[in-house]
Amino acid sequence: MSKFLLNRCIRDLSPLTVLKDNLQQTAKPILNYYAKNAASRGIKVLFISYETLEKEAPEGIDCFLYATSWEKVKSLKELYEHISSWRTQGKQHIVMIDTINPILNTSISSFTMFFGSVLALGSICFLTSFHKDVTLENYPSYLPPCEVFLDFTSTCTVSLIGMQHLSVEHDAKMRSLPNPLLEELQDDKIISLLGSNCETAIVLHVEFRKKSGRIIKESCVLKNGKLEPYTPFEETARGPEPADNQIDFNVSFNLNVSEKERKERDKVFLPYFSAQMVGSQHKSSFVDEGTIIYHADEADDFDEEEDADEDLLI
C-alpha cells in the first residue's frame, strides 16, 4: 500500500484531481509523473491538449487528442464522443487535460455536465491543471472565485511551489525581511522569477476530500521523478533569556537593585494610586481618572494671610 496520498489517488482513480499552477511553477512535471505511474499500473491514459504540442506530451500516454485547431475548438460533446469511443471495457482510464481554463471559460453548466457524463461511464477519472494567473473573462461573477469553486468540485487538489522559491522565502523570514518574490512580482517588467518552473524539486501540498466531506492533507516533494517526504524548514531556535541579575549593560555603574532596595520600593505608595481607588469605589465621585489626591501633613504650614505674589512686587 502506497504511503503517499497522491499515489493512492492514482490507484483508486480519484474522480477529479486539479493541479494549481502559475507562471512561477508549471504542473508539467506532475503530469509526467502521473503518466509514468499510470503506465506502470496498466492504466490507459488519454491526453487532451489545449496548449501542448504532441512532441511535448508526457511519456507513457496511449492517445493524444488536440482540442483546438486552426479552424475551430472542439466542443465538449465532441470530446465526450471521442472519450466514450476510446474507452475499453474492463480497463482503468485516466483523462489528462493540460489546462481546464478554456472549459471553465465557456460555461459552468456545460463543465459539470461534461465531467458528470464522462465519470458515469465508469472506471475513469480526470487529471487537469488550472492556471491561477489566467483571467477567465466569461466566468460568472455571481459564483465564488474559480479556485474556490474547484476546491469544492474536485476530489483532490494539489498546490505547487518550487523548492528554490520556498528556500528564498524561508531565508527572508529568518532575517525579518519582506518576501523578495512578492516584491519582484510587483514590477510589471518581470514576468518570471529566477528559479521558476523547477523540475528537480517541487513541493506538493495535497488536499483530498473524502465522500463524507472530511479533508485529508499531506505535503510531499517530487524530486527527480520520485515522491519523497517533505520536511519543513526549521526556524532558528532562540536561546534562553538571561535572568535579571545576569544582564550586563556594559556601563561603569551598577544598575541592579538589591533585595533591601526592592522591598523598600514596594512600600512606596504614590498619590495617584489613591485616585484610582477612590474612583473605583465611588463611581459617582468627583474624582476623574488621572487625578492626584494630596493629603496635607502636619509639617505643611500654610499662612492664609501670606500673599503669594508678594515676592514679585518691586
Curated annotation (Swiss-Prot):
<comment type="similarity">
    <text>Belongs to the ELP5 family.</text>
</comment>
<dbReference type="Pfam" id="PF10483">
    <property type="entry name" value="Elong_Iki1"/>
</dbReference>
<dbReference type="GO" id="GO:0002098">
    <property type="term" value="P:tRNA wobble uridine modification"/>
</dbReference>
<comment type="subunit">
    <text>Component of the elongator complex.</text>
</comment>
<dbReference type="InterPro" id="IPR027417">
    <property type="entry name" value="P-loop_NTPase"/>
</dbReference>
<dbReference type="InterPro" id="IPR019519">
    <property type="entry name" value="Elp5"/>
</dbReference>
<keyword id="KW-0819">tRNA processing</keyword>
<dbReference type="GO" id="GO:0006400">
    <property type="term" value="P:tRNA modification"/>
</dbReference>
<keyword id="KW-0539">Nucleus</keyword>
<comment type="function">
    <text>Component of the elongator complex, a multiprotein complex which is required for multiple tRNA modifications, including mcm5U (5-methoxycarbonylmethyl uridine), mcm5s2U (5-methoxycarbonylmethyl-2-thiouridine), and ncm5U (5-carbamoylmethyl uridine). The elongator complex catalyzes formation of carboxymethyluridine in the wobble base at position 34 in tRNAs.</text>
</comment>
<comment type="pathway">
    <text>tRNA modification; 5-methoxycarbonylmethyl-2-thiouridine-tRNA biosynthesis.</text>
</comment>
<protein>
    <recommendedName>
        <fullName>Elongator complex protein 5</fullName>
    </recommendedName>
</protein>
<dbReference type="GO" id="GO:0033588">
    <property type="term" value="C:elongator holoenzyme complex"/>
</dbReference>
<dbReference type="GO" id="GO:0005634">
    <property type="term" value="C:nucleus"/>
</dbReference>
<dbReference type="GO" id="GO:0005829">
    <property type="term" value="C:cytosol"/>
</dbReference>
<keyword id="KW-0963">Cytoplasm</keyword>
